[in-house]
Amino acid sequence: MKAFKAYDIRGEWGSDLNADIAYRIGYFLPDILVADTFLVGRDMRVSSDTMFDALTRGLTDRGKDVDSIGLATTPLVYWSTAKYGYKASVQITASHNPKDHNGLKISAANALPVGYDTGLNRLEALVASDTPTKPCANKGQIRERNVYADYLAFQKQFVGDLSNLNIAVDCSNGMSSLFAHELIGKAHYINDTLDGNFPNHEPNPLEANAQEQIKALVKKEKCDIGLLFDGDADRITFIDEKGRFISPDLIIAFLGDFFIGEQKQKGIVLQDIRSSRAIQEYLDRYHAKVETWRVGRAYAALKLRELDGCYGGELAGHYYFRDFYYSDSALLAASIVLRLLAERKKAGQTMSQIIDEITPYSNSGEINFKIERKQEAMDAVRDHFTQIEKPERFLDFDGYRLDYPDWWLNIRPSNTEPYLRFLCEAKSQSKLQELIGTVKGIVKHFACLFIAVMLIGLASCQDPAKSRIYMDEGNKLMMTYGKFAEAEEAFDKAIQYDKNNYEAYYLRGCAKINEKKYKDAIADLEKAIELKPDYADAYFNIGRAYFLLHDEEKACEYYKLADHYGRPNLEDYLRKCQ
């Protein structure tokens, strides 16, 4: 069944999930988790009430009682499960997925996550089977339970004096709206009412278009920091006072100032395999040990508990805490980051200065290759580098991670899509670009074979008219609505129907700049120039991309080429090159 994922159940409501499936999930869940009473919370999505009714009807038809805590953040369900000793719980949410999706996050006793390998596989088999459902004679009851007061009292012990901070908060019209005002206090709030239609932006804090409003608010109000929550408040990202996105893994290092520096907690710090080496280097001041593990809550929460680690985090913006029953909480992470920043501000430090102190590295960000032969490509990358030099550290439990003295890389497969995900970090921008180029060259062979198979039949059906339709669609998405990811997909289709459409490559490159995918943008813009060598705007935007990568020398080179080919109004840009 399509909705059963590695970490949870999630999919489009009405197709991947519906009331009948939700009922059967509730009915068969007691076969996976033995409990007399199930704790259930839900988010504010349009379909969540319907899903709650169907799920709980399935549970009560099996004779199980339900304690409903009503509208809840996902971390509130985790906390309540462990705090009150429930043996099983369900949160109805699709987290950061689009508005027409919904899902279920299932936990066992102590808020231990139930993933595909630890129960969802068996549940899927039962739900998909022909096994009939039959209400029992002694049906269970649904009771309302109010846990808000206890939860807020727990959270408030981590809140510091924030009176010297100017804070911006974007709740994404999601569940953090329930508690943000009370825990954060005075701030500039946007999108802080519950709305399952997500009218302002998608509730995914890693998406560039979701970050636009909070970045603008930070700059407009001259804030010290911006907070951007996801839909169910288990993830958060931060924006510095300059309006720049902070890579979430670097916050793992900063949290150490509180847990290890101030509270003197003992125990390992957990990071995922994509996380920066800067975390360990920063935490060396506390003689802390950082353990690297697999991506995903189903793995991280269990590993942190196994290690009795004090806290941990992921590149995706999840932060886990021993004090939070080894589970993740965006609001708790926010409280601690704000508390630390308030103290640092008294000493004259800004958020950007703190991050610069944490990391000396240039980072590629995650680069995706569309490819079927993922394992072969990964092996080829591994073999290329290990044959040149033995790495200082080699990890192979979530793809491969190779660590060398001045750089490292991770290459890992997507579990659900034909993508190979690559990320690297180096102490110099030149080394970073060299690594990216090398890996692209290795993977290109495997990717091209896959693309060649996909394009059989397309080669003989090039259609410039269809290409123009997708071009216009992408341009509207990008220029009118600011939906850069969707625009990129439209330009992909435009290129499929006309591989010589230089404008499509150019516009896709511009979309990628807005998504902060600068290196990929440069590749598209260079392709546009290959097809149209005098394309002044393409030269100019390559210059922009290099400038945003802090390579001013290359930026100036392309600004001058743009000027040479007749792009007007470049005086301010060229002045920087004097």
Model-based region annotation:
Residues 1-57, 61-63, 142-164:
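An N-terminal, well-structured beta->alpha segment
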